[in-house]
């Protein structure tokens, strides 16, 4: 009985082998599309609060989603407030009011004080 031909063993799961493709003349290399996220900022805040703690990519994805959600809610509420008051510009006042409306009690107070601090720091650096 003939033995089946042995083929090269399949690469192990997770092995990273570079696959090189020859590029023809005139072909343009495709640039990787940039994906914006808040991950570097979340990481910086994490290191300020808990310097010895890390974060998984799944948790980072959740945090990114959370920040995007809060951003959209605040922007939407601020836009509504500007529209109600017949204003065409969203100022720090609309943002502050939107934060007070959206966030509960103590959290809103802390957010407003941190926001005021950030705006003051920005205007003084100009």
Curated annotation (Swiss-Prot):
One function term, GO molecular function aspect: protein heterodimerization activity
Region Disordered: start-end pairs: 1-36
PTM per Swiss-Prot/TrEMBL: Monoubiquitination of Lys-121 by the BRE1 gives a specific tag for epigenetic transcriptional activation and is also prerequisite for histone H3 'Lys-4' and 'Lys-79' methylation. Phosphorylated on Ser-15 during apoptosis; which facilitates apoptotic chromatin condensation.
Residue numbers bearing the N6-acetyllysine modification: 6, 13, 16, 21
GO biological process, one term: defense response to bacterium
Cell compartments where the protein resides: Nucleus; Chromosome
CDD domains assigned to the protein according to its UniProt record, in alphabetical order: HFD_H2B (cd22910)
Modified residues (Phosphoserine): 15
Regions of compositional bias (Basic residues) in chain numbering: 13-34
Stored Gene3D superfamilies: Histone, subunit A (1.10.20.10)
Stated role: Core component of nucleosome. Nucleosomes wrap and compact DNA into chromatin, limiting DNA accessibility to the cellular machineries which require DNA as a template. Histones thereby play a central role in transcription regulation, DNA repair, DNA replication and chromosomal stability. DNA accessibility is regulated via a complex set of post-translational modifications of histones, also called histone code, and nucleosome remodeling. Has broad-spectrum antibacterial activity. May be important in the antimicrobial defenses of chick reproductive system during follicle development in the ovary and egg formation in the oviduct.
Protein name, as recorded: Histone H2B 1/2/3/4/6
Organism for this UniProt entry: Gallus gallus
Phylogenetic lineage: Eukaryota, Metazoa, Chordata, Craniata, Vertebrata
């Amino acid at each position: 009985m003939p033995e089946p031909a042995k083929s090269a063993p399949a690469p192990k799961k997770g092995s990273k082998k570079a696959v090189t493709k020859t590029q023809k003349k005139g072909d343009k290399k495709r640039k990787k599309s940039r994906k914006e996220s808040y991950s570097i900022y979340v990481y910086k805040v994490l290191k300020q609060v808990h310097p010895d703690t890390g974060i998984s990519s799944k948790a980072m994805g959740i945090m990114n989603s959370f920040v995007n959600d809060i951003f959209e809610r605040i922007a939407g509420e601020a836009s509504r407030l500007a529209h109600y008051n017949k204003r065409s510009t969203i100022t720090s006042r609309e943002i502050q009011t939107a934060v007070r409306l959206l966030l509960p009690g103590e959290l809103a107070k802390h957010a407003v004080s941190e926001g005021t601090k950030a705006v003051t720091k920005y205007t003084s650096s100009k």
